């Protein structure tokens, strides 16, 4: 079984130059522009059962005489917010380590917040809170749990965890679509490692798109609030005055890294769909209409020679179409102004994308649109990113020889649940992504398995750990 006989240092200066150039000018810029999805095995047969259904704002308000008394909201929501530690090993590596070794690592810890979604232990947080973690701890009620990472969705910056516990105080659910600008909201989290901190503010805006998500298909329709949110609040709860969840605290706009008046939360209606999909399918189901829209405004109207003398620029402008895609087949054309999706007004790109985010591949939707000043309607069938109407399911490969489970990612093949075999012998870390083997890019997990089961000879394994730090391996299989 032991075919690995040693780890050897490279010795050619050309290899050093090539590794340095490829790392710094090709790979790392790509990694800085993208966000990697991470998952762990789970069973997807049963949907999430919520213990506290949406209340639709029908809980009696607080008896307090003051409109700015948030004690009811705090008392209801604080028990449902947890403290999260993300533990990972940070390696220090330079291209010279290809020659001389010398990589070092140390344990690092970052913290954030999470919200208990169900009484049986499902917790939602931000993807950026746990994306580099090799181990995740949930601190709740003076007890520390090791959490299982069920799945993440970089397109919304959300992640789902699971702890082994029952009868937890699940958060009450409100409706972000019913939330009004100017309404009071309360942010609950653990800023600067201060547990159960409560701040209050109002809803400053809805449907904000601020360009912070680096996924290929980002969905940004944030709730903006002036409630103070600081480092450590990420993944915490944004609730209304009744203590019902309306958003997951996610980001701030700041030049200092601390609160300066602008904070943003993922709407709860989007969050619930993401959680349901991850638990049931292992991945989030995204539905595409086969085109790209931009905001409809004066400048874009001029660009498409549209009438600029209109009372208001309501809707979104169809910029481009995928040939033979759903929108193309439905008769839509670039320059059309989409005003409604299934009767719901969409007056911004973020509103349009949010409306589609609730849909599934195979769903039929009706678009109302303007062409030459005339209103029209058309119905189309949404598809997945592969162009079919099938639901997407996560696919995991296992190999006793490698001693790990594998799955395809945007960058290569990720190895996780490493329990033995070659990868354990080599000391490959959990959530290591294989980018290339013997300088050939890899994308298919089965190809990796076949290689390790059949190949004999020297192997150059190039990849990155969960912190996206490059770690190469050089060894021989016999």
What are the roles of these predicted feature ranges?
Residues 78, 396-428:
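Extracytoplasmic/periplasm-facing segments of secreted or lipoprotein envelope proteins
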Residues 335, 431:
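Conserved catalytic motifs of ABC-family nucleotide-binding domains
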Residues 154-157, 410, 468:
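Short acidic/glycine-enriched loop/turn segments that link adjacent beta-strands
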